[in-house]
UniProtKB/Swiss-Prot annotation:
It comes from Bos taurus. Its EC number is 1.3.1.20, 1.1.1.179. GO terms for molecular function: D-xylose 1-dehydrogenase (NADP+) activity; nucleotide binding; trans-1,2-dihydrobenzene-1,2-diol dehydrogenase activity. The keyword Transport does not apply. This is Trans-1,2-dihydrobenzene-1,2-diol dehydrogenase. It holds the Pfam family GFO_IDH_MocA. Belongs to the Gfo/Idh/MocA family. Homodimer. The record marks 180 as: May play an important role in catalytic activity.
């Protein structure tokens, strides 16, 4: 049976997600509805992507009995309201990262999903890329020896992109880019809670975080560090180092197709998307997470074993602690 998707928000990421879904077999995935807060935008989106139904409110999509799973592609401060709306209506939910602006928002969403027994997942699409799965295998086999350190960087000049610097919309590098780096470190160290978190950072003139470096000390004397920036170009790579060697995910590390293990290059090409244009790099790679959601639902799972909800909560806790350390608060934070 095809999984029937409803797309919440008609923005750029939703467009890429929908373009990708339409490339997958119709026997497995179908987009049945889209909702925007402006009906004309929803209709335009529906026309572009050949979606049967367009709604001018998220409520209408949540109530649509044809929708099995809602994809939440709004800006992050709007995630919580949209997620709760869809969960209350009995829908499974795939919510874009970061799940929430702060830990309290994430806990509220997770509690709602659990109390209703509904599938809920944070769309950390990176984890499902074959290059990242290959890295996990390398780690599981002990190829790198005893692990010592994970390092990640994600930065580019986004100061011309309004949402990146918009304080009211919880912009900045940490929630948008840093979460990719952080989830890599967390993945390598098995979703453990860090023993110590330290951070330094620069504020952007709008009040969001501009460039931040974080060090995370984990049990067993291992650590991870990452730098994220919305104003400077960084290497956009991840390295995992141990006593027997190093593995690297090359740029673009958030949607990687190349893994280097002890100097040996391996390529993992994306599925073909002939004639399709994406707003974001390697957009067709979202297909890996979409397939995962379908598999989880077919198995009757309520959460992903690859990105469990407890880890989404942990990532939110760490990002909040980092923001406190560098003095960044957003209007969504409860003071």
């Amino acid at each position: 049976m095809a999984l029937r998707w409803g797309i919440v928000s008609a923005g750029l990421i939703s467009s890429d997600f929908t373009t990708m879904l339409r490339m997958l077999p119709r026997s497995e995935h179908q987009v049945v509805a889209v909702a925007a807060r402006d009906l004309s935008r929803a209709k335009e989106f529906a026309k572009k992507h050949d979606i049967p139904k367009a709604y001018g409110s998220y409520e209408e999509l949540a109530k649509d009995p044809d929708v099995e799973v809602a994809y939440i592609g709004t800006q992050h401060p709007q995630h919580k309201a949209a997620v709760l709306l869809c969960l209350t209506a009995g829908k499974a939910v795939l919510c874009e990262k970061p799940m929430g602006v702060n830990a309290a928002e994430v806990r509220e969403m997770v509690a709602e999903a659990r109390s209703r027994g509904l599938f809920f997942m944070e769309a950390i699409w990176t984890r499902f890329f074959p290059a990242v799965e290959a890295l996990r295998s390398v780690l599981a086999q002990g190829t790198l020896g005893d692990l010592r350190v994970v390092r990640a960087e994600f930065g580019k000049n986004l100061t011309h992109v309004h949402r990146a610097t918009d304080w009211a919309q919880a912009g900045g590098g940490l929630l948008d880019l840093g979460i990719y780096c952080l989830q890599f470190i967390s993945m390598v160290f098995g979703g453990q809670k860090p023993e110590k978190i330290s951070a330094v950072g620069r504020r952007h003139e709008t009040g969001v975080d501009d460039t931040v470096t974080v060090i995370l000390q984990y049990p067993g004397g291992v650590h991870g560090s990452f730098t994220c920036s919305i104003s400077a170009q960084l290497s956009n790579t991840v390295s995992v180092s141990g006593t027997k060697g190093m593995a690297q995910l090359l740029d673009p590390c958030w949607s990687p197709t190349e893994l280097v293990v002890k100097g040996e290059h391996k390529e993992f090409p994306l599925p073909p998307a002939p004639g399709k244009e994406f707003n974001f790099t390697n957009g067709m790679g979202m297909s890996y997470e979409a397939k995962h959601v379908r598999e989880c639902l077919q198995k009757g799972l309520k959460e992903s074993p690859v990105i469990p909800l407890v880890e989404s909560e942990l990532l939110a806790d760490i990002l909040e602690e980092v923001r406190k350390a560098i003095g960044i608060t957003f209007p969504q934070d409860k003071h």
